[in-house]
Amino acid sequence: MENAYSKAGVNVEAGYEVVERIQKHSQKTQRTGTLGMLGGFGGCFDLSSYKLKEPVLVSGTDGVGTKLLLAIEEQKHETIGIDCVAMCVNDVVAQGAEPLYFLDYLALGTVNPAKVEAIVAGVAAGCCEANAALIGGETAEMPDMYEADAYDVAGFAVGIAEKSQLLTPSNVKEGDFLIGLPSSGLHSNGYSLVRNIFFKKHSFKTTDKLPELAPKTLGEELLTPTKIYVKELLPLLKAGLVHGAAHITGGGFLENLPRMFSSALAAEIQLNSWPVLPIFKLIQKYGEIPPEEMYEIFNMGLGMILAVSPEHVEKVQELLPEAFEIGRLVPRKTKAVIFKEAL
């Protein structure tokens, strides 16, 4: 017999099924400190094994933005959870902290257990990549708020650091080298503009195969998951090799780089020092976007940029052979970010 909640559009039984389906995915993410209490009123994590003199918890929260619309249109939900985790844990590790645990929030018009499982499986995969435990979350069915197929996902990450080892603007010095870590593509920013350029202005289809993106289709390129930098950065952080880190997300170089150094400094960027990924060249071409604006919106092929003292550059490059030396920190005159070579 249909109950009152079902008549209002909320499928309670589907919600119960979701809880059963996602248990196995969260269990894969367990790490030291996990108490295995998924399903309680709050997620619990034991910090007693982390022997720090002045422990500091560092938290981050984010979503995936309108990249979700592509996932919904393409009915490909398996990797969007990786994006959600990446956006949060990359912010946490950029502060100098080791991610410990993660919680997700999923709001939908209609709960489809298989779809929710696919999304949460992606979250769990991202957590495994970041070595962060998935200790809780919320799935909210809101038929009056969302269309039947629509959903939104957000995440919350918490990490830990010794207070003296936090990456703060005061750590970054004049003469420090800027080391860029390659991105996997657009990551999770700029999709409102990108969708407008490719699908509205130029009527591309997600199945289109552009030579510059081969062997991927346009849709596959745009749904490539955001790269998670935790495994690359933690050894450097523990060895004291990094003065600062900037996660290049919304706002690109111009907004995010200045967040890691003081107002007395500027980032001098050598533009020809790394390969700009083909997807960005296509966006600039078809969107007729001025070069400087591209660096104000997108990561341009570098998802994380580190400030490293001259004496540590060689060691960092040894540990991160795929990274690029892209510039230096110099005294600021006017602009916080200076591009060498004409844009």
Curated annotation (Swiss-Prot):
Keywords: ATP-binding, Cytoplasm, Ligase, Nucleotide-binding, Purine biosynthesis
Gene Ontology cellular-component annotations: cytosol
Record organism: Enterococcus faecalis (strain ATCC 700802 / V583)
GO biological process: 'de novo' IMP biosynthetic process; adenine biosynthetic process
Major localization class: cytoplasm
The enzyme's E.C. designation: 6.3.3.1
An annotated Gene Ontology molecular function: ATP binding
Cell compartments where the protein resides: Cytoplasm
Keyword field contains ATP-binding: yes
InterPro entries: PurM-like_C_dom, PurM-like_C_sf, PurM-like_N, PurM-like_N_sf, PurM_cligase
Pfam families the record matches: AIRS (PF00586), AIRS_C (PF02769)
Reactions performed catalytically: 2-formamido-N(1)-(5-O-phospho-beta-D-ribosyl)acetamidine + ATP = 5-amino-1-(5-phospho-beta-D-ribosyl)imidazole + ADP + phosphate + H(+)
Enzyme class: ligase
Domain of life where this protein originates: Bacteria
Pathway it works in: Purine metabolism; IMP biosynthesis via de novo pathway; 5-amino-1-(5-phospho-D-ribosyl)imidazole from N(2)-formyl-N(1)-(5-phospho-D-ribosyl)glycinamide: step 2/2
The family this protein is said to belong to: Belongs to the AIR synthase family.
Protein name: Phosphoribosylformylglycinamidine cyclo-ligase
